[in-house]
A protein has these predicted regions:
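Gly/Ser/Thr-rich loops at beta-strand to alpha-helix junctions
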Residues: 102-104, 235
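HTH-adjacent hinge/linker in prokaryotic transcriptional regulators
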Residues: 2-23, 27-97, 101, 108-116, ...
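Conserved phosphate- and dinucleotide-binding cores of soluble alpha/beta proteins
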Residues: 2-23, 30, 45, 127-259
């Protein structure tokens, strides 16, 4: 097996399991532990995984955000409920921003009947999903493509966002601590902040597992959003700081509480 094929196969293992040991990878691919370490070093340098004691992980940490393919497999039912609720906030004729996240990306499958509609996004999955949808005008934000996030970021993206004004922005973040949102990646933070500035109304969509976490970069206070949408699974402990601060928290279950 060629080194590049083996590294892709290592990523496939991590996408499925989240973590893997050097010993297991060595046995699986029939190579030395030293070779596995070199593969993991290269993949870590590319920002695709993080090395941990005895192996590697693709799971999030305060400094590392998971690959989008792994995140898409997590809390899928909850994310779908949140996305369906968010779609109910959109009216025909509006313009909306959708960020790069897997939670907001799920909105794309819920808005095909809301027409006409302008969707502006740096999320390649959303662009691909809606590119042929009748009555939906898709504006793709350019920039440097990130394989890890499956989205576009950087100077070109930021300049485009600075020139836009939209009705609604739907964003997510990888960590909520107290009444603030955080993220691991600096360029992602910059794009999200500009999306907040570009919108009349803004909603943060996060599954309940994002609460009680922190990450390297402060994104914004939650009071920047008209509401925070999450699953009914969110604990009272994590909901309390938002409610005490007067931040609108919508717990979405099958009854779809109104925002």
């Amino acid at each position: 097996m060629k080194p590049e094929d083996r590294r892709q196969a290592i990523m496939d293992v991590l996408m499925e399991a989240g973590t893997a040991s050097v010993e297991d990878l060595s046995l699986r691919f029939g190579v030395s532990k030293m070779t596995v370490h070199r593969d993991l070093d290269d993949l870590e340098q590319a920002g695709l995984l993080r090395k941990v004691h005895g192996g590697a992980s693709i799971q999030s940490s305060p400094q590392f955000e998971s690959d989008f393919r792994y995140r898409e497999k997590i809390a899928t039912a909850e994310k779908r409920r949140i996305a369906e609720h968010a779609a109910g906030l959109i009216e025909p004729g509006q313009s909306i921003l959708i960020d790069d996240s897997s939670t907001t990306g799920a909105i794309a499958d819920c808005i095909r009947d809301i027409r006409p509609l302008t969707v502006i996004t740096n999320n390649l999955g959303v662009i691909t999903s809606l590119s042929g949808a009748a009555g939906i005008n898709v504006i793709a934000l350019g920039g440097q493509y990130s394989k890890k996030f499956n989205g576009f970021f950087g100077i070109v993206t930021d300049e485009a966002l600075r020139s836009l004004r939209v009705d609604i922005a739907f964003l997510s973040s990888s960590a909520i601590e107290g009444t603030a949102a955080f993220h691991q990646d600096q360029e992602v933070v910059q794009a999200k902040r500009l999306m907040v500035k570009a919108a009349k109304r803004k909603y943060l969509l996060v599954d309940h597992d994002k609460f009680g976490r922190s990450a390297l970069h402060f994104l914004t206070g939650l009071d920047a959003f008209d509401a925070v949408l999450t699953g009914a699974e969110v604990s009272a402990e994590h909901a309390a700081p938002l409610e005490e601060a007067g931040i609108r928290l919508v717990r979405v279950d099958n009854r779809k509480e109104k925002a």
